[in-house]
Design a protein with these regions (language model features):
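Acidic/histidine-rich catalytic neighborhood
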Residues: 2-58
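Active-site core of glycosidic bond-cleaving carbohydrate-active enzymes
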Residues: 39-209
Length: 210
């Protein structure tokens, strides 16, 4: 939380905190110098600060708790273009030229849960974003954990049929060996990919309430 609070850049004119360039977002297909306010990082920073503020308050660190909560409440809004969430505020072509790798827009609500994660998400825009990802994203470029991320996004919207479809979809990196480990079968140098297993387990726990 100390790092996040220090890393964010305050704009006194708008009274918001931004993630400024250069930065490499979770979708590592963007030039660091062009990336500003990546959507997942905005949501995750806010999420982390709110958790830290709660813990700090409970431990008696009230000054830190107040500071972190205030920053969380003034983090830049999630970037939107044409009624869908986009990768970052300088990426209006998210769904044309950048529809590859991790669909980080879906992580802001599907993966994050509680601690006000839902407060900054417009459910209609989020649903539009999910459907846009399913429609245009290059699934061959997804990683093993992305399929469960998409499934969790669908589940949060009450679309469990789509969630299960995404968990079971036939795609090069949504593959499992006899041991149960996720593998990226298009990568000879990556026989096992444990983030895929972690994501699958989290999605299953959410969807089946276990």
């Amino acid at each position: 939380a100390v790092f996040i609070a220090d890393y964010l850049v305050y704009d006194p004119m708008s009274d918001i905190y931004n993630i400024e360039a250069p930065v490499i977002p979770v979708q590592e297909r963007h030039l660091p110098e062009d990336t500003r306010n990546p959507i997942f990082e905005l949501a995750y920073f806010r999420y982390g600060l709110l958790i830290a503020a709660k813990w700090a308050y409970e431990l008696g660190f009230t000054d830190e708790a107040s500071q972190w909560h205030n920053i969380a409440m003034h983090i830049a809004p999630l970037p939107i273009n044409d009624d869908v969430y986009i990768a970052h505020s300088n990426c209006p072509d998210t769904f044309t030229n950048k529809a590859i790798d991790h669909p980080l827009m879906l992580q802001i609500y599907g993966m994050l849960d509680g601690y006000g994660a839902e407060d900054i998400v417009d459910k209609d825009i989020y649903r539009n974003t999910l459907m846009k990802v399913i429609d245009v994203w290059d699934y061959s470029t997804l990683w093993g954990w992305d399929f469960a991320v998409i499934a969790m996004a669908a589940h949060k919207l009450g679309l469990d049929d789509i969630a299960l479809e995404q968990l079971l979809i036939n795609s090069p990196k949504n593959d499992y060996v006899e041991s149960g480990n996720n593998r990226q079968n298009s990568r000879k140098d990556l026989p096992l990919y444990l983030p895929g297993n972690g994501s699958l387990l989290l999605a299953a726990a959410r969807i089946f309430n276990i």
